[in-house]
């Protein structure tokens, strides 16, 4: 069964992450300028950097969406027109907006940019989605709280020209589509103006009211004790349902995460989307790839009802570590590498890259920049060479299981 292929939208917290997402198969990337983005600590693009980022993406056939999704105060609104004009002039394809005033100003000062409505607007029904379309929105990012049946209903009862976007992978906020005041209250950092401190991820202790100052740590057992820590969403096994529900764009969360995360998760979803759209069984090797990045235990979120939200632990699973990044490779497989973490001759490592299925090898003797034998590269970012069984593309990764890193 052939299906319409949705856009794959990947995070790009900086230029390295953007290039990785592009190389590994993103149809579009989303990023932020230095103002009015919801993840001010996730990496941003300056006014000088943004045109270069847009040009790079467009040269590779990839669209650029920019977040303008904070809830600005009156004292901040005067800076919006100039910011929007810069985005418009840079060639940005779409703006992700949450505030109605910012949405209106975007129509005036960034007329070349599509207007997409952020998940911060908590769009949970067809009437709200249609209302935004009637106001001029090209796309709405649906609330994470929706079930698959609710998405189908929204698709059925809205204009077919309105595009529906939903998150398919990554962290989930325990608040209603990000409308949380914990950060404001506990740290003074406004979660709805791009400065969330993520207090829902903290580990808490208990204090009994008649024993002030005595703190009892919250221990974890087989039933779980962490509070407010949701699992990460992973819908890679259910992309057929999302496509059949009428979703036009699948979004990967993670602008604050690593370039390796952006690459591996994008690559995994790229291959599975292509398989499902062509009616082929999904190759399990790509499903396994999402287990090779740092993540919390996975769930299907609310797509199939509340049970997908049950959780036992807030701890990250970090089973794999990057050793090096391939910066170049000859047709014979002689790879030039940039070191990220120590490894040595004789270790078993994996190689994975753009359109490259992961394969294992035993590390041979390496060579430093002066052509001298190298048993264990140790200096971060150092350049060295290593022979591989076959040629691989630039931006491929050498990685190993974490238990090897103690050698």
Stretch-by-stretch model annotation:
Residues 14-17, 35-126:
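Active-site beta->alpha loop and helix N-cap motifs at the rims of alpha/beta catalytic domains
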Residues 1-23, 28-31, 35, 60-70, ...:
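Surface-exposed amphipathic alpha-helical tracts and adjacent flexible/coil segments at the periphery
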């Amino acid at each position: 069964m052939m299906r319409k292929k949705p856009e794959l939208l990947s995070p790009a917290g900086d230029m390295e992450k953007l290039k990785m997402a592009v190389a590994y198969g993103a149809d579009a990337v989303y990023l932020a300028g230095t103002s009015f983005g919801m993840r001010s600590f996730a990496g941003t693009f300056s006014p000088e950097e943004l045109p270069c980022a847009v040009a790079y993406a467009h040269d590779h056939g990839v669209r650029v969406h920019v977040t303008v999704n904070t809830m600005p105060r009156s004292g901040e609104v005067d800076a919006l027109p100039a910011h929007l004009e810069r985005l418009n002039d840079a060639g940005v394809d779409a703006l992700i907006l949450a505030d109605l005033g910012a949405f209106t100003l975007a129509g005036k000062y960034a007329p070349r940019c599509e207007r997409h409505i952020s998940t911060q607007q908590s769009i949970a029904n067809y009437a709200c989605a249609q209302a935004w379309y009637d106001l001029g929105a090209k796309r709405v990012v649906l609330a994470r709280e929706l079930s698959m049946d609710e998405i189908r209903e929204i698709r059925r009862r809205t204009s077919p020209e309105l595009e529906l976007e939903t998150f398919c992978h990554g962290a989930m906020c325990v608040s209603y589509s990000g409308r949380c005041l914990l950060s404001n209250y506990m740290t003074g950092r406004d979660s709805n103006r791009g400065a969330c401190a993520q207090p829902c991820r903290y580990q808490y202790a208990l204090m009994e009211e008649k024993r002030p100052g005595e703190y009892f740590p919250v221990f974890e057992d087989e039933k779980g004790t962490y509070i407010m820590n949701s699992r990460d969403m992973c819908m890679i096994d259910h992309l057929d349902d999302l496509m059949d529900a009428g979703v036009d764009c699948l979004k990967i969360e993670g602008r604050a995460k690593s370039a390796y995360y952006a690459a591996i998760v994008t690559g995994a979803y790229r291959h599975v989307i292509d398989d499902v759209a062509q009616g082929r069984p999904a190759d399990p090797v790509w499903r396994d790839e999402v287990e090779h990045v740092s993540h919390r235990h996975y769930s299907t979120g609310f797509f199939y009802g509340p049970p997908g939200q049950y959780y036992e632990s807030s701890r990250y699973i970090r089973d794999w570590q990057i050793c090096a990044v391939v910066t170049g490779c000859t047709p014979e497989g002689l790879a030039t590498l940039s070191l990220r973490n120590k490894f040595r001759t004789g270790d078993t490592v994996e190689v994975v890259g753009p359109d490259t299925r992961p394969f294992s090898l035993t590390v041979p003797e390496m060579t430093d920049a002066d052509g001298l034998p190298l048993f264990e590269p140790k200096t971060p970012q150092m350049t060295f060479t290593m022979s591989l069984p076959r040629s691989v593309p630039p931006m491929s990764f050498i990685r190993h299981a974490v238990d090897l890193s103690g050698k």
